[in-house]
Amino acid sequence: MQRETVFDLIGVGFGPSNLALAVRLAERSGAHTLAHCFVERQPAFGWHRGMLLDDCRMQISFLKDLVTMRDPKSRYTFINYLFERGRLNEFVNLKNFYPTRVEFHDYLSWVADAFDDRVHYSETVLGIEPVRGDGARIDALRVLSRDAAGHERQRVTRALSVGVGGTPAIPDAFAALGRDRVIHSSSYLTDIDRLVASPDGERRRVAVIGAGQSAAEVFIDLARRFPHVDANLVMRAGALKPADDSPFVNEIFSPEFTDVVYAQPQDARRALLERYRDTNYAVVDRPLIEQIYEMLYLQRIDGTPRHALLANSAIEAAVRTADGRIELTLRDRMSGATRIERFDALVLATGYRRDTHSALLEGLAPHLGDALTRGDVTRDYLLATPEHFAPRIYLQGCCEDSHGRPTRCCRSWRAVRTKSARRSKTGSRPRTMKAWPGPRTKND
């Protein structure tokens, strides 16, 4: 095991949140003196690679990239990426605010390439341990990791930025069915050819479980790309609902609204988030809904309905049959009647769990008091730790319950303060809070 190296900051994970942090540190005056690095388990930068479908577009404007909303003069903007790639003029000619997901991934990779000397790829963080000082004081954190060759490494840091992303959510009903017939949408492009392979030329019936954007994208991709597949979209909802991305509602993704959400009592905050749930959860972009509706309609013309939307369907049970297929017991949520549907494979578009950070920080639990279990986080995304715990732990992408919906741009640069002179020691709410001003008007 190599000798410990001491850092001012270590980022665990190198997705968009910590990538935005790397940009902020690179551009901050004096930040070059800050010893920092990032540890990433993937062999190279990757962002939702399993869903980089060719014709799928971003749901946010390219202006909400890693840096434009903070500093449009930055060299790391999407516009400068287009300029450096020699495509700026052609992109302007498209007259489109929403690049393809493939292109935006290429932009993120382009930015990530600038920080190769700061990122340790193919390293899995095994755990975080406390470094003790005098008495009960915890002075620093020890990050334990293992690379692809099996070599273990220790690094000591005074601050930690946890940006590990989500973990695919697999509902209990599907957990025991086996990966040979069931995949999560996060690995769709990697696994789908194997999943629907038909050496004998027989048709394959595939169920997509979910009612959100990923479910809709997978459903229409299966229908268009695999002539031998009969795709079925199974969902509890009665219909695919469009995402609300109207201008006034989009104001909830502003920093000012985050202040408002954070200042609310827990019950009021929960109600406020529920009110705007249709901006992000179990909703689909309207153009995609229209494409799916048209596809299902056109089937009726030639009388060969291969694909179907099974709405109002609650899944009561899921079992493997003797021939290896999957049998779903579906209950009609309107009539209460049950029926059995059999499929050759399932794609679960069931979202992500946002609790990975808890397992990562488990070794620190005895020293953190109730902060970790309660999710006690300050407005600056800093875990509120006891007085004897000196290291700073910032949580990225897992604070929706306290801060509201993740903003539709990469804003982790706001979360991490690179100076250690001042830090919040409690998770208390601010005593006063300026009200959210609402949308600006011409009289402002």
Swiss-Prot record:
Positions of NADP(+) binding: A211, G212, Q213, S214, R236, N280, Y281, A282
A Pfam family this chain is assigned to: Lys_Orn_oxgnase
UniProt keyword Protein biosynthesis present: no
Stored InterPro entries: FAD/NAD-bd_sf, Lys/Orn_oxygenase
Domain of life of the organism encoding this protein: Bacteria
Ranges of Basic residues composition bias in the record: 420-432
Binding sites annotated in the UniProt record for FAD: E40, R41, Q42, P43, A44, F45, G46, W47, H48, Q59, V125, R408, C409, C410
GO molecular function: ornithine N5-monooxygenase activity
Catalytic reaction list: L-ornithine + NADPH + O2 = N(5)-hydroxy-L-ornithine + NADP(+) + H2O
Biological process terms in GO annotation: biosynthetic process; intracellular iron ion homeostasis
Cofactor: FAD
Similarity-based family: Belongs to the lysine N(6)-hydroxylase/L-ornithine N(5)-oxygenase family.
Stated role: Catalyzes the conversion of L-ornithine to N(5)-hydroxyornithine, the first step in the biosynthesis of all hydroxamate-containing siderophores, such as ornibactin.
UniProt protein name: L-ornithine N(5)-monooxygenase
Annotated source species: Burkholderia cepacia
